[in-house]
Amino acid sequence: MWLCALVWASLAVCPIWGHPSSPPVVDTTKGKVLGKYVSLEGFTQPVAVFLGVPFAKPPLGSLRFAPPEPAEPWSFVKNTTTYPPMCSQDGVVGKLLADMLSTGKESIPLEFSEDCLYLNIYSPADLTKNSRLPVMVWIHGGGLIIGGASPYSGLALSAHENVVVVTIQYRLGIWGLFSTGDEHSRGNWAHLDQLAALRWVQDNIANFGGNPDSVTIFGESAGGVSVSALVLSPLAKNLFHRAISESGVVLTTNLDKKNTQAVAQMIATLSGCNNTSSAAMVQCLRQKTEAELLELTVKLDNTSMSTVIDGVVLPKTPEEILTEKSFNTVPYIVGFNKQEFGWIIPTMMGNLLSEGRMNEKMASSFLKRFSPNLNISESVIPAIIEKYLRGTDDPAKKKELLLDMFSDVFFGIPAVLMSRSLRDAGAPTYMYEFQYRPSFVSDQRPQTVQGDHGDEIFSVFGTPFLKEGASEEETNLSKLVMKFWANFARNGNPNGEGLPHWPKYDQKEGYLQIGATTQQAQKLKGEEVAFWTELLAKNPPQTEHTEHT
């Protein structure tokens, strides 16, 4: 290993394959899996890593647009030491996201396949003992249309905090979301895959040193939305015990406004499956090749497909479930970043607002174009411009303020409303706002953007311990965030000795500002929530409401 030590002397991580003397082999309910040991500098106990462990049958043929089924058993020792293919998606955009948010040093080979229901496991446990460590299950983001498990290395988080980290995959885009609005294709296949992965964890994680009675689900963006959908789903009862939503909750997506049949009809027309019945349409789409569906995906407006109120995963709208308090009231961390629309989202959307300047007329026409996504009627646009843009005459500042408005509508306000509902139902709730610019982000990003969408991921996964270039300040911030997240996974409370106090989100609405300075504050987005609540109460948007039959 001297060569490894010499070549990578400047790095914080040096993988040592086959250490201890033989690689780890673990029994699952379906068969044995072979992993590999990876050591992190400063830790005597290596992390056992298992990549591409199947948790369901490949969702092919008749299982396309159908609930996942348990994997078939195998009689040999399955080699799980290479990254699995990511679920089918637009490869160009998928690579862009993976490059931007990859938390580890290792280059992840980007392969895509419809056969993708796999998970990765990082366990610091001595597998010869009954360790029962807390388990943290990561649900990746990417708008439910792109992304995968492997860009998120659980190596540093598992080693530093002595937790078992599991990163899961789920069907994306048309494969994960296609719904006819009836029993022929109810939709929410992505969430059913997530539930199948959590059931697999319940049945198997003890043999990897994890405690099935201490499972925390955490995710970012669409992963955060998924976490909150699972909290609201009766199907997820007892599958997890704590939850963390980073930059996304299910209230973000206006699910009760989605016209499922119209979207299905558009897909049918574009695909040439324009049949008279739902059953025939589904049958026709099942005959399409993966490449044909991928071509269809690229043609589709990505915002047209989403989680639906299917009567199964979600029996009612999120708002109704929260009002009735009929959900899994587990301890919950909810948070978002200071500038969610700072750079990465506008870039992924094709350089949204590429002009460096903005005036009221431009803002008004822009808001009209996006009014369906914002769930607003056009009549309220003047009030929004008055609230957000009138405080300055600087056209560059006006653009920043308009992006702040998008951050509020899509992230800040839904997070606060969700947290209030969780609190009122008796779930121990903690809120944060992340305010830091990681050193690992693209050089193309403006220096002024602090706390962009996805920035907290580098701290959560301990990237300063896996990649070179982090300052002492950034390294310490990552230690702090990992400690908060892991304490919460252990105890349902992020607080611990030597940490800044994180207040519970109660009627005082205390929260934590996390960044170069980490401190308590109160009433996160309180003024903005009051503005939007009053505005929408007086001017409800005229949109269609469809549910499954």
Curated annotation (Swiss-Prot):
One Gene Ontology cellular component: lipid droplet
Protein name, per record: Carboxylesterase 1C
Pfam families for this protein: COesterase (PF00135)
Active site: 221 (acyl-ester intermediate), 340 (charge relay system), 453 (charge relay system)
Cysteine disulfide links: 87-116, 273-284
Entry's localization field: Endoplasmic reticulum lumen
Motif (Prevents secretion from ER): 546-549
Residue positions where Phosphoserine is found in the record: 471
Glycosylation-annotated residues: 79, 274-275, 302, 375, 476
Function: Involved in the detoxification of xenobiotics and in the activation of ester and amide prodrugs. Involved in the extracellular metabolism of lung surfactant.
Keyword annotations: Disulfide bond, Endoplasmic reticulum, Glycoprotein, Hydrolase, Phosphoprotein, Serine esterase, Signal
Organism: Rattus norvegicus (Rat)
An example Gene Ontology molecular-function term: protein homodimerization activity
Enzyme Commission designation: 3.1.1.1
Main localization category: endoplasmic reticulum
Gene3D superfamilies, sorted: alpha/beta hydrolase (3.40.50.1820)
pH dependence (record): Optimum pH is 7.0. Active from pH 4.0-8.0.
PROSITE patterns: CARBOXYLESTERASE_B_1, CARBOXYLESTERASE_B_2
Family listed: Belongs to the type-B carboxylesterase/lipase family.
Gene that encodes the chain: Ces1c
Chemical reaction(s) catalysed: a carboxylic ester + H2O = an alcohol + a carboxylate + H(+)
A biological process from GO: lipid catabolic process
Keyword Cell inner membrane: no
Signal peptide: 1-18
